[in-house]
Amino acid sequence: MSSREDVEDVETGERAEEQPFLTRETEGDGEASEAGATPSTSTRLNNPPAWSEKSRARRPHGLCKLSLFILLFLVTILGLSGLILSFPPKGTRNSDNDAHSHGDQEKTHQDDPNHGHTGDEKPSIVHYHEDIPGLPRLRDTSEYVLSPSWDRSSAPVTREYHWTIADGELNPDGVYRPMILINNQFPGPLVECNEGDTIIVQVENKAVNATSIHFHGLFQNGTNFMDGTVGVTQCPIAPNSNFTYEFVVQGQSGTYWYHAHHSAQASDGLLGPVVIHSKDELTLQELDYATDRVIMVQDHYHNTTAELLMGYLRPDGENDEPVPDNPLINGRGVRNCNDFKGWRCDSSNTSKPIFDLTAGQRHRLRFINAGAFAEFQIQIDEHPFYITEVDGTDVHPEPFHRLNILPAQRYSVIVDTNITTTDTYWLRARMVTHCFTTKNNRLQPEIRGIVRYISPNTKPLTSDPQSKEWSEAIEVQCRDLNTSALHPVQHMKPPPADDFVTLRSNFMIGDWRLARGFFNESTWHANATHPSLYRFLDAKPELSSLETPLAINDKAFDKEHDFVLQTKGIRTVDISINNFDDGAHPFHLHGHKFFLVAQGRSGYPPTAATLDKYLQEHSGILDNPLRRDTVTVEGYSWAIVRVVLDNPGLWTLHCHNTWHSESGMVMQLLVQSEVHGYHQERD
C-alpha cells in the first residue's frame, strides 16, 4: 500500500463533525425502502445555500434537532413497514413497477450500452456501481468508446454513481507511485448523460487526505454549492466521510471532465471524462460520424503532488514549475524500467494505446487535456481532421492537422479513415517543452498511440506503424491554438458590455519570497473550514450589499487573499486579462462560458473606450465569436473576454495550470448577490 497512509493532511484533516458545513444524516427515502434498498448514510450540505429566495445557510437549534430525530424515527418505521410489505407472495412475479427495483438497476457501462435504457419504458433512476476488489488496477478504457445506440432523445432520468475514493499504488507507465483512485481504478469512470438528466455522485472518502470533486465546465445553475471548489463553495470531504453531489445538467452539451479541486490532487489520479448528449447533437455536429470516443492526454509525474508543491512553493523558487516525467493517453504510458534504477517498476503489462477505427468512415475523437502543466500538440500522421467542438461549443468544421491543447481545454475532431498508404498510423501527443523552465533528466516528452484501420481482413498487429510525420516545422512556442476561424453553429451575438474590468496576472518572486501568483494585488489562500460562500452568507448586510452594480467586495472579504468581484443584477462584463509573466496561463471560469472578443501578443490592450475601434481596425468579430470556458493568455500577452454574469453564485476565475492556481492565481466572481434573500433574520 501507499506510504500515504502514514501521512496526515495537516491543513484539512478535520473530520466532518468538526467542519461547520459538513454533517452526516441518514437517508430514509421511502422510495428506496419500497424498492428493498437499505437506507445509507451520506454527508450532504445541512440546509445548503440553494440559490433561491427561500434558501439560506442555517444551523439547527435543539428543538429543530429533536424534531428532526422524531421525523427520522417515523420515516424509518414507515420504511421498514414498506420493506416488509414489498416482498411478493411466494410463487408470484414482480410487477412491472418492481422490475426497476434498486437491485435491478445496478448496472455498469459494460453491462448495458444505454446505461440502463432498455425497452420502451425508461427507469427513473439508473445506478452505476463498480465493485473492484483486490489490487488497484488500470481502468479498461473501452468504456470511453461511446455506444452508437445511446438514446439522445430519451426522457430525463437520474443517474446515480457510487464512488469510493482511496489511496493505492499503481504504475500507469510501469513506474509505481502513490495515487488517489476512484473505485480502485485509474483513470476515473466515464460520466455520460443527456441534457436534462440529474446526476448524483455519492462520494465515500477512504483516502487519508480530504478531497472534493469539481465537474469542469458544468454551469451548476441553481446548484452553486455543488461546484466542488474547496475554499469557495464547500469544505473538503474529510477522510472517512461521505458527500453527495447532486445537480441537473441543463443548458449545455458536449465534452467535459471532472477532477479533484483540492490542492493538486487531480494529478494524483482523481479525474475522469464527462460527455453530455443533446437531442440535437447530430444537427449541431455538421459532419456525421460512425464512432465516438474520448481521448484524455495528461502530463504525468512519478512523485506525488504534495512533494512537488513543497519544492515549487519554496522561498526564492523563481516560479520553476515541476517538469513532468512523461505523458499518458487515457491513463497509460510506456517507460523502460532500466531507466528507473531504485524505483519500483514493472512495465510488462504496459503497451501503446490502440484506437481501432473502421476504414472508410468518419470518427469523432473528443480530446481532453487533463494535465497539470504541459501544453500538448496532437496529430495523426497523414490525416487532417476537422475541429467541430471547443469546450462544449459546437463549431462549424474547420480543417487542421495539428491540435494545440492546454490544460483544461477540450476539442472534438472528426477524422476520415480514407488514407490508403497503410493500415496503421501514429497518433502523436507531444508536450511543448519550451514552456519548461527547469531540466528533468528522465523527461520523455512524447507519447504515441496507434490508429489502426480495421476491416474483415484485419490482421494482428505485429509491428509499429511506418507512417509519415507532417513535413512542416513543429511549433516550439507555448501558444494557444489559433481559433479565429472557429465560429459556433448556434449563432449568438454578444450583448453590449456594461462594465470593463482589468486584471493583471503575475508572480511575486525573488528576494527569497515565496513563489506566489497574483491577480492585481491579491494572492488567494483557500480557507478550507470557512469557504467564501458561507462567509458571504453569514456576513452582515452592510458588509455584503452593494451600492453600485459592480464592485470589489473588500468589506466581507480580505482582498489581500480573497479578490471577490461582486455584481448586482445581470451584468455583461468585459474582462481584460493582462499576463505579465513569461509563461502561458490557461484561465478557466467556473459556471459560465464567455465570448472570446480579442487577443494580442504585443502592445497594450484596448480599453473600454477604444475596444470597438480596435476591433474594427483588426478585423475583430463581435457578430458570432467563439464561446468557451478556458482561454490561454500567452506570456506577456493579453486577452479580452465578454461574459454575461447571469448565473447566481460564487464562481472562481483561475489559471488552470495546477501549480499556478495553488500559488494563488485565483479570483472570485460573486454573481447576482441581491436576489437570494441572504439577509433574512437567521434562526
Language-model region placement:
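N-terminal edge beta-strand
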Residues: L170-C193, G342-D356, K540-V573
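Extended terminal and domain-junction accessory segments
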Residues: N46-P49, E53-R152, A264, D268-G311, ...
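Acidic-aromatic/histidine active-site loop/patch
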Residues: T291-R362, I368-G371, M508, G517-F518
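Intrinsically disordered, low-complexity terminal tails of fungal membrane proteins
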Residues: M1-R59
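A cross-kingdom feature marking solvent-exposed beta-strand/loop segments within repeated
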Residues: M226-F243, S351, Y386-D416, A556-H561, ...
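Short tyrosine-centred short linear motifs in exposed loops/low-complexity segments
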Residues: N194-D197, S241, V248-T255, G360-Q361, ...
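Asparagine-centered strand-capping/turn motif at beta-strand->loop junctions
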Residues: V203-A207, F367-G371, S576-D581
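Aromatic/His-enriched, Gly/Pro-containing loop or helix-boundary segments
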Residues: I182-E192, G222-Y256, H261, L282-Q285, ...
